[in-house]
Amino acid sequence: MRIGTGYFNSRCSITVRLLTWQDEAIDVRFIRRRIESAFALRQAMLPPRTTGYRLINGEGDFLPGLVFDVYGDFLVCQFMAAAANILKSLVIEMRVALLSPQGIYEKSEGSVRHEEGLLNTAGVVWGQEPPSLITIEENGCRFFIQVQSGQKTGFFLDQRNNRALVGSLSRGKRLLNGFSYSGGFGIVAAKQGAQRVVSVDSSAAALHLARQNWQGNDLPDTVGEHIQADMFSYLRETTEVFDVIVLDPPPFIRRRQDVRAGVKGYKEINLQALRLLPPGGLLFSFSCSQHLPMRDFLQTTLFAAADARRRVQILQHLEPGADHPINLAHGEGSYLKGVWLRVGD
């Protein structure tokens, strides 16, 4: 009995990457339809003056293992499955025809490639080399992007809507941006009138980029402070009180066997953050660990609130924006999860 059409890879735990349930050829016309559909979705959903966004989100756009991000006039691509890798030259050609970028940079790296039997690959695949800093616009702010050396493809595009939400609630507030990377949450908050923004990250390079972004948005130095520190230690040692805290850590759970240790980490940072919030204070807490489902993440924050002896309300569950669609049949694509919490009076 025929089920569908996809690519088979005997070397990987995911042996089949299904492309269609229909009896149709996987040819140029098929791939073009999928790419054009993804592009049309972004054109319809993206806020105006947004020049950094995800154009193709793998399984979420029914193109397994394929990621394309737009940063101004440049594209960054990832071919994270053998099925996507087979289509590389065809997909790049179509991207050029559709968007006319100045250059396309491939950044196909990580353990997923290894499992698929592929080597890590990084470098220009079409056109010009991206400059060391690319400027994009988002939420009325400018951000410098480091494609070659930055985290992920250069920026955490999946947090755009959540940055806008935090910014809208930050006027006159004292905000702590934990695991700040290039400062996104804090910069949007400062643009919206935050009274004070403290950005904490363990990476000197990330904080240097955050300072560049701060200056690039003409924000006053008297409002912002950038601190290089381990976030766990900072939360335990600081005596400063904040009105809004954002926790957007790297994944504490990269493998299933890391779940127990990772849950302890999430509980600890949320517990310590809740200690620093006054009644009415807001906590935006995120996890990008694929192996931690939302129900377990919420339970972890519940235990943190109990140990901190704080009464806490859930105001909203948080997810990526519409440029990161999730295939209903691919729950693993729902990696980023967050919760907006309020400390009770």
Question: Which positions does each model-derived feature cover?
Answer:
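Non-catalytic accessory regions of SAM-dependent methyltransferases
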Residues: M1-G72
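Non-catalytic substrate-recognition/targeting regions of SAM-dependent transferases
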Residues: I56-D69, N85-F156
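Conserved SAM-binding motif I beta-strand of class I
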Residues: R196-D201
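C-terminal catalytic and target-recognition region of SAM-dependent MTase-like enzymes
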Residues: L282-D345
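Mobile active-site "lid"/loop adjacent to the S-adenosyl-L-methionine
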Residues: F242-Q272
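Conserved SAM-binding loop of SAM-dependent methyltransferases across substrates and taxa
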Residues: S182-Q195
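S-adenosyl-L-methionine
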Residues: A205-V246
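Conserved class I S-adenosyl-L-methionine
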Residues: G172-Y181
